Design a protein with these regions (language model features):
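Short alpha-helical functional segments enriched in proximate histidine and acidic residues
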Residues: 100
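Aromatic/basic-lined ligand-recognition segments
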Residues: 97
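Structured aminoacyl-transfer and RNA-binding surfaces used for tRNA recognition/handling
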Residues: 1-92, 104-127, 131-134, 142, ...
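Helix-hairpin-helix
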Residues: 177-178
């Protein structure tokens, strides 16, 4: 109460800290969160879009599935990549997902490597029943993701060019990949 008095709650509850994913894995008798129906459709999407198999790139596929899901929800809730706060966290999540996906294919940062926006529909289709607002924001999330990734790629490409030029000026031989 306002005066600091504690009053027992009408319902006695205990927060186990288990979370939705852990509860789903127990109820569905799965070994981990990524084998549940919360993640498997997204994992299948990662495999299709990147043309890789979870068995060969287990950690990569799990990271991308987890990060794309978080990204879709964050952008859907109005969080945009920025240099501070939640926006900074989102930016780091996007970069990590893109980075592990690109490295799994042995690719250099190129525009045609952008793939995360293609995974938005897998998340939305899987979660729209429980979160119908995701369906309403599908196009916005996907287009924002594409814009954000293109900006990131341009930044990274410029950074790589700077490093390559510095190495050349120092007498190192640098192969042209960009």
């Amino acid at each position: 109460l306002e005066d600091g008095t504690l009053v027992p709650l009408p319902e006695k509850n205990i927060d186990t800290g288990a979370g939705l994913e852990r509860i789903a894995s127990v109820l569905q008798k799965k070994k981990n969160n990524f084998e549940t129906d919360l993640f498997m459709p997204i994992i299948k999407g990662v495999e299709e879009v990147l043309e890789i198999k979870k068995e060969e790139f287990d950690e990569t596929v799990k990271i991308i599935a987890d990060h794309i899901r978080a990204t879709v929800f964050l952008i859907g809730d109005g969080v945009l990549p920025s240099n501070e706060g939640r926006g900074y966290v989102l930016r780091k999540i996007i970069r990590r997902a893109f980075g592990v996906g690109s490295s799994s294919k042995g690719k250099v940062f190129e525009k045609e490597d952008v793939f995360l926006h293609k995974l938005v529909s897998y998340v939305v289709n899987n979660m729209k029943e429980a979160y119908p607002e995701l369906e309403e924001k599908r196009e916005y999330i996907s287009s924002y993701k594409m814009t954000s990734l293109n900006n990131y790629l341009n930044y990274e490409k410029n950074q790589l060019l700077k490093i390559a030029n510095q190495l050349k000026e120092s007498g190192y031989e640098v192969k042209e990949y960009i």
